[in-house]
Design a protein with these regions (language model features):
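Rhodanese-like catalytic fold shared by cysteine-dependent sulfurtransferases
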Residues: 1-20, 27-57, 64-123
């Protein structure tokens, strides 16, 4: 299987449907601007964290799409249904879709910290 690239319009439909969106950039990159509601799961934490993501399709993003493509491939290899946004968060923002600067107000930062703790306990 190969992870599928989706355009911003399709990504928006998935986002509205409640599919899980993960931003695989570093926490500092994530804080500079990310898709509203996206979980911050840096690429290097993804293999261990994949088991704990909700059982729904997963949409990955990064700055421009490169790391998101790798993340979607990893998720696909782990048996998950994964897609990545062509052009990443940059394309999402250029389309005028919701972007948050700083940590997510709904606790997504806490979810990121959970992934970091989970990874350190697995090492």
């Amino acid at each position: 299987m190969t992870a599928e690239r989706v355009d911003v319009s399709t990504a928006q439909e998935m986002w509205r449907a409640g599919d899980t969106v993960i931003d695989v950039r570093s926490p500092s990159e994530y804080a500079q601007g990310h898709i509203a509601g996206a979980l911050n799961v840096p690429l290097d934490t993804l293999p261990l964290g994949a088991r704990k993501l909700p059982d729904r399709p997963i949409l990955t993003t990064c700055g421009m799409g490169g790391r998101a493509g790798r993340a979607a491939e990893l998720l696909d290899l782990a048996g998950r249904t994964a897609f990545y946004i062509a052009g990443g968060t940059k394309a999402w923002a250029a389309a005028g879709l919701p972007v948050v600067v700083g940590p997510e107000p709904d606790g997504s930062r806490d979810k990121h910290l959970w992934f970091r703790r989970h990874r350190s306990h697995q090492a």
